[in-house]
Amino acid sequence: MTRTVGSTAADTGARLRQAALQLFARHGYAAVSMRQIAAEIGVQVGGLYNHIPDKQTLLFRLLSEHMAELLEAVEAAEIPAEPLPALEAFTRFHIRHHAARPEQVFISYMELRNLSPENFALLEAQRQDYEARLSAILERGAAAGVMQVEDARMATMAIIAMLTGVNTWFRETGRLSLGQVEEVYWGMVRRMVAA
Amino acid sequence: MTRTVGSTAADTGARLRQAALQLFARHGYAAVSMRQIAAEIGVQVGGLYNHIPDKQTLLFRLLSEHMAELLEAVEAAEIPAEPLPALEAFTRFHIRHHAARPEQVFISYMELRNLSPENFALLEAQRQDYEARLSAILERGAAAGVMQVEDARMATMAIIAMLTGVNTWFRETGRLSLGQVEEVYWGMVRRMVAA
């Protein structure tokens, strides 16, 4: 019995996150009420508060879980130690991971302005943890003389922006497969830091 | 007398756009009412309708004027004909132009989803007009053998994403001047298409 109740609660929690994600992505955080989210998943608005104390916490959890999932996934991707193979693995990982989560990526950028200062600081720490992995690859590559990197921080931001930008134009029904996109982007990233 | 009335109307129109831009950037289009915009500039909501028929038209004009201004500015930048100097001039122009307009750039990306299909199509045409200028430079460079470009469309999207991405991290009070940022980004763009 406890188990069934637990499963149902977990299920409602998951549907709540999914509904909030879609409503925030479509209309924006500020325009969506807890009442609308409750209606979307077919529960009373009071029932939501068993799962989440308020809308700000809901937004923060969505963004923070997106970053936690990214950090776990990059860990699981087993990026090699050698700088150039590491950069290739990171490039391909970043494109694939983000292309599979367009709504999370969109609200992660768009709704930063709606986080409380405390929540924004927590999210920034997660983001910097991810960015630091790419910066470390570039610094190792520059130190080993296999990459030219004037400024590891700017190169990190440039590479992440160009890779995440794939989400703005890539369509699965388009002329190119994601594998072809990865290939061309890896060529551009490799040249961008060519020693 | 006509002249004074005309100037006042133009002034209200400009203040209306500025207020809408800031409110949309802060709260999102869907969360902002015409009443709030009117309150922000100190007029009755009925007075807004002398300037703009509805909120959708207001959003479209903001985004469309941003693109029109971009197209005029790139024209005025007198990009040279030679491919490599053209790419350098385009890179520097794009960073400078966008860094000076963070709110317009932000809502131009974020509020695309709130345009009507007709307005979206009009804006897309303007955007493609701009992107085509960069694609043409890359194609000329590849044809002349001074650039390596596997896919001019993807290289265009990659370069624009990385350059516009400067807006997400650059602060005028930071460790770098915009001139230094331009310099490092031009180095990365040049290598990205190195033949």
Question: Where would I find each of the regions flagged by the language model?
Answer:
Chain A
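Short helix-capping/turn signature of helix-turn-helix
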Residues: 52, 109-115
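Amphipathic alpha-helical packing segments from all-alpha helical-bundle domains
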Residues: 65-71, 118-143, 153-157, 183
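N-terminal intrinsically disordered/low-complexity leader segments
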Residues: 1-11, 150
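Helix-turn-helix
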Residues: 15, 19, 23-57, 61
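Short amphipathic alpha-helical elements of helix-turn-helix/winged-helix folds
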Residues: 19-23, 93, 97, 162
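Hydrophobic/aromatic-rich alpha-helical bundle segments in the mid-to-C-terminal region
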Residues: 105-110, 120-121, 142-188
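Hydrophobic alpha-helical connector segments
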Residues: 61, 75-103, 155-159
